[in-house]
Swiss-Prot record:
Role summary: Involved in the intranuclear transport of ribosomal precursors.
Chain's gene name: NOC2
A GO MF label: mRNA binding
UniProt GO cellular component terms: mitochondrion; Noc1p-Noc2p complex; Noc2p-Noc3p complex; nucleolus; nucleoplasm; nucleus; preribosome, large subunit precursor
Protein name: Nucleolar complex protein 2
Pfam families: Noc2
Record's compositionally biased regions (Basic residues): 1-17, 25-38
Source organism phylogeny: Eukaryota, Fungi, Dikarya, Ascomycota, Saccharomycotina
Region ranges (Disordered): 1-64, 76-114, 138-169, 672-710
Family recorded in the similarity comment: Belongs to the NOC2 family.
Biased composition, class Basic and acidic residues, residue ranges: 76-85, 156-169, 672-691
Keyword Phosphoprotein: yes
Oligomer status and interactors: Interacts with MAK21/NOC1 and NOC3. Forms a nucleolar complex with MAK21 that binds to 90S and 66S pre-ribosomes, as well as a nuclear complex with NOC3 that binds to 66S pre-ribosomes.
Further remark: Present with 29000 molecules/cell in log phase SD medium.
Length: 710
């Protein structure tokens, strides 16, 4: 007896009793319905039909055998056997006797003729006995005697047929060698008369091509590829010609700027073929090594997008793979190609793709920016800018997604602050700051500042406020909380990095953010109040690609000089935002007073010289604004006129603006020289590695030659 399945056990324990009870009730109800007057079955109606005599005969036939007598009386009378029809009996016996007599007569006649043959021609009779004895065996045979031998023959024949079929299946399973001639034949058929069968064969061969490196899967496929030319021809044909053939077989329509498939026709069958083809495209996307291949594959996927929109899982995997190419490649051109695909398809198929693309892009970006250095920073900045543009496609959806992720950042900050202040927190207070003080968290804050800067520019809004503008306040609050979490000199690089993102946000959105207090705290820290240590062997600290100062640089002269340089640059960048503002003199007056006081008490000559230059430029710009506003006839309440003040003057034509522009050029020149030196170092390292590989290969070749000589 087979094992009882789990579903059967479940039915027996829960539903069996109820089912049996229900069947009993139904049976009783059926009997009641049949017992009612007029509710007769077909058999009962047939029994009721006929004459009265026929009904009495039927009734008497159904009566019991022992009616009106006992068992003993019945056996005493004896058993009466019903009489057979004599005519029928005579007929059947006569037929049987005729058959038996005819067969026996034939046997007797045959025996007599053989006896006469033996008398007349004994030599021929002897010849028959020696060569064909079965011919003389003329006795009657039973036809059932040959059944066993016949069955054995049929079994042998059946087994041979099965063997032939299995051999045929093995022959069919033999792989088809993909030749260049076959590929070109397929290509011609694609252009002339594409069909579903042809598409299936091509896609099956393409699946073999993309899985050549996976030996465990090769045995399952119909085709085998050994010709390199056929391989390349197949790849180009599938990526270029197959999408065009699919569009011929199931053409789409453009409705409201988006490609839409009609109902009916070959759409469902073609879409199922494209669905199976998507798996090969995913493998190809994950193995992209150069820009040319990336552009070709992405173009092919773009052509097939209308046929994949109904398959949500495959669509999600495609987005994930393309975003993976966008985030992991080190080639800028490949990044641009993948970003172009994402922004074009999300604009066209906004409802189907945009939300998934935004969430996948952000999560993938955060994972990829864990390690940040001089080499990876340009690519990370490109990812930030391109992803920020994606969030501007639909600002309502961008607000929903952005609110969710900024809220997560605020929760992380709150948990960190609770861990450092409350003893009941489950997080280790000594390690809690690492949740916030890392590159991923800082890049995330900087990314959202770029998103809001891109979407909340007054020129773009044109009088209608962007929904994303509501996220500026919570983002600024989280950023300020992160800056002031640990106000020690060790994390001043992180402070500078986040201040730059706040300056960018204030510049593009027009929102005033009080940044000077964050900068002034640096001047009163131990980095400037304590006497620095000498460090002749240390290089200049890289504030652009670090958020934490190492112990080797703390309290050193070179670190202090780097802090003073960063302070002056950020101070100039911040006040350059308001260098044309009509209220600039009132804005900088407290700053000028505090800086002059600091210069009087400070003994750092280099810092004092830099601060004096900044104070001088602030005073010059303040005088410039006072001269320009002396002729205006509007008051502070007239906001439209205030916003148009000095619109015809470029920011770098002001005293402070020209100073900041020169400082930025010097800074950019230093960064360019550092990048060039880094690229030269990379090239030297690559050449050394190539030489080392060549030397190792030559050594291996020499060893092979020595072994062959031996």
């Amino acid at each position: 007896m087979g094992k009882v399945s789990k579903s059967t056990k479940k039915f027996q324990s829960k539903h069996l009793k109820h089912t049996l009870d229900q069947r009993r009730k139904e049976k009783i109800q059926k009997k009641r319905i049949q017992g009612r007057r007029g509710n007769k079955t077909d058999q009962e109606k047939a029994d009721a039909a006929g004459t009265r005599e026929q009904q009495q005969l039927k009734k008497s036939a159904k009566e019991e055998v022992f009616k009106d007598m006992s068992v003993e009386t019945f056996f005493e009378k004896g058993i009466e056997i019903p009489k057979e029809n004599k005519k029928l009996k005579k007929k059947t016996t006569k037929e049987q006797s005729d058959e038996d007599s005819s067969s026996s007569e034939e046997e007797e006649d045959m025996g007599q003729s053989m006896a006469k043959l033996a008398e007349k021609d004994p030599e021929f009779y002897k010849y028959l006995e020696e060569n064909d004895k079965d011919l003389l065996d003329f006795a009657g045979t039973n036809p059932l005697d040959g059944i066993d031998s016949q069955d054995e023959g049929e079994d042998a024949e059946r087994n041979s047929n099965i063997e032939e079929k299995s051999e045929q299946m093995e022959l069919e399973k033999e792989k088809i060698e993909l030749s260049l001639k076959l590929v070109r034949k397929w290509k011609k058929q694609l252009h002339d008369s594409p069909s579903l069968k042809l598409l299936r064969n091509i896609i099956s061969a393409f699946k073999v091509a993309v899985n050549l490196n996976k030996e465990e899967n090769i045995e399952d496929y119909k085709y085998a590829i050994t010709d390199e030319k056929a391989f390349h021809e197949l790849m180009f044909m599938v990526l270029k010609d197959v999408p065009q053939a699919i569009q011929k077989m199931a053409p789409y329509k453009i409705v409201k700027g988006a490609r839409t498939l009609p109902n009916g026709g070959n759409v469902s069958r073609v879409s199922s073929i494209v669905k199976s083809h998507a798996g090969s495209l995913l493998i190809l996307l994950n193995d992209i090594t150069n820009t040319e291949t990336a552009a070709l594959v992405l173009h092919s996927v773009n052509e097939l997008m209308p046929y994949l929109l109904s398959y949500r899982r495959i669509l999600k995997e495609l987005i994930k793979s393309i975003v993976g190419v966008w985030s992991t490649t080190r080639e800028l051109e490949t990044q641009i190609a993948s970003f172009a695909f994402l922004i074009n398809t999300t604009k066209e198929f906004k409802k189907s793709m945009l939300e998934t693309t935004l969430k996948t892009t952000y999560s993938t970006f955060i994972k990829s920016c864990r390690k940040t250095n001089m080499r990876s920073m340009p690519l990370i900045n490109f990812q930030k800018n391109s992803a920020a543009e994606l969030f501007g496609i639909d600002e309502v959806l961008g607000y929903q997604v952005g609110f969710e992720y900024i809220r997560q950042l605020a929760i992380h900050l709150r948990n960190t602050m609770n861990a450092t202040t409350k003893k009941s927190s489950k997080i280790n207070s000594a390690e809690a700051y690492k949740i916030v003080y890392n590159w991923q968290f800082c890049h995330s804050l900087d990314f959202w500042s770029r998103v809001l800067s891109f979407a909340c520019q007054p020129e773009k809004e044109n009088g209608s406020e962007s929904p994303l503008r509501q996220l500026i306040y919570p983002l600024v609050q989280v950023t300020l909380g992160v800056i002031r979490l640990i106000p020690t000199p060790q994390f001043f690089p992180l402070r500078f990095y986040l201040i730059k993102s706040l300056i960018r946000l204030s510049q593009n959105s027009g929102v005033f953010i009080p940044i000077y207090p964050l900068l002034s705290e640096i001047l009163t820290s131990t980095a400037f109040t304590k006497a620095p240590k000498k460090s002749p062997n240390l290089a200049a600290f890289d504030f652009e690609h670090n958020i934490k100062c190492t112990q080797a640089y703390l309290n050193t002269k070179i670190y202090q000089e780097g802090l003073s340089e960063q302070f002056v640059d950020l101070l100039g960048d911040y006040f350059a935002l308001y260098c044309k503002n009509i209220a600039f003199p009132e804005l900088v007056t407290p700053v000028i007073i505090s800086l002059r006081r600091y210069i009087k008490t400070s003994t750092n000559v280099k810092l004092n010289k830099r601060l004096s230059t900044v104070v001088e430029k602030l005073n010059q710009n303040s005088t410039f604004i006072q001269e320009k506003r002396s002729d205006v006839e509007f008051g502070p309440t007239n906001k439209s006129e205030v916003s148009r003040f000095l619109n015809d003057v470029a920011w770098n034509k002001t005293p402070l603006g020209s100073y900041v522009a020169v400082q930025r050029e010097v800074k950019e020149e230093k960064a360019r020289l550092m990048r060039e030196s880094m690229e030269e170092q990379d090239k030297e390292r690559e050449t050394e590695e190539a030489k080392l590989l060549n030397s190792l290969e030559s050594d291996d070749d020499n060893e092979d030659v020595e072994m062959s000589d031996a």
